[in-house]
From Swiss-Prot:
Belongs to the peptidase S1 family. Snake venom subfamily. It comes from the Eukaryota. The keyword Nucleotidyltransferase does not apply. Disulfide bonds join C31-C163, C50-C66, C98-C256, C142-C210, C174-C189, C200-C225. Monomer. SUPFAM superfamilies: Trypsin-like serine proteases. This is Venom plasminogen activator. It comes from Agkistrodon piscivorus leucostoma.
Length: 258
């Protein structure tokens, strides 16, 4: 009953809450109920915050700019209107952000690793996503997903998570769209030449999935979302795999790549 009340409150608040720094999927369709088993919902007493990705039963990846006080994480949700019996709620036990992250730049090293207060149980609607074994290839078709708004011009939250296919873009294309990006950057850009398919308000922290692996974390983009010449920018997870694995193994003093 407690979980049901928490979920009900979350979903009611989610309808009216707009997070300025979050991103959301536009131009997509309802995700298949079994394709987002790793997708995590972040919320607090004010409402919906961000998305995240389960990478094993005890650890979750999200964006560093999604950090907030007193948030919880919800696993196994598909519909606001229909409860899954295997939905689970967890609190963060430990949060890890790159110690060498620029504090005055929320786009820098935009990754956070969270240890849960207790492991989640894998189930029909809950399962982790693999870390990348190699960097993403330009042109690869990848999947974005999230609970964010489905309209680039007004806040319109769906009852179910939406998914869309987009492509990994060459970093030169990204730098042409965003000249402030460094030539060597631990980010990856993804989008389509046509306007419409993109992350938008509400999707920050969620995954960019390529070949069944998490290659990116939704970080930032131009506004309004869905502009073909302004692709979404994602934290490049492959560049942080050593940092992630070191922390999980107990070496919490490790720093992130420059």
């Amino acid at each position: 009953m407690v979980l049901i009340r928490v979920l009900a409150n979350l979903l009611i608040l989610q309808l009216s809450y707009a997070q300025k720094s979050s991103e959301l999927v536009v131009g997509g369709d309802e995700c298949n109920i079994n394709e987002h088993r790793s997708l995590v919902v972040f919320f607090n007493s004010s409402g919906f915050l961000c998305g995240g990705t389960s990478i094993n039963q005890e650890w979750v990846l999200t964006a560093a700019h999604c950090d907030s006080k007193n948030f919880q994480m919800l696993f196994g949700v598909h519909s606001k209107k229909i409860l899954n019996e295997d939905e689970q709620t967890r609190d963060p036990k430990e949060k890890f952000i790159c110690p060498n992250r620029k504090k005055d730049d929320e786009r820098d090293k935009d990754i956070m690793l969270i240890r849960l207060d207790s492991p989640v149980s894998n189930s029909e609607h809950i399962a982790p996503l693999s870390l990348p074994s190699s960097p993403p290839s330009v042109g690869s078709v990848c999947r974005i997903m999230g609970w964010g708004t489905i309209s680039p011009t007004k806040v319109t939250y769906p009852d179910v998570p939406h998914c869309a296919n987009i492509n990994i873009l060459d970093h030169a294309v990204c730098r042409a769209a965003y000249p402030t990006l460094l030539a060597e950057s631990s980010t990856v850009c993804a989008g389509t030449q046509q306007e419409g398919k993109d992350t938008c308000g509400g999707d920050s922290g969620g995954p960019l999935i390529c070949n069944g692996q998490i290659q990116g974390i939704v970080s930032w983009r131009a506004h309004p979302c869905g502009q073909g010449l302004k692709p979404g920018v994602y934290t490049k997870v492959f560049d942080y795999t050593d940092w992630i694995q070191s922390i999980i193994s107990g070496n919490t003093d490790v720093t992130c790549p420059p």
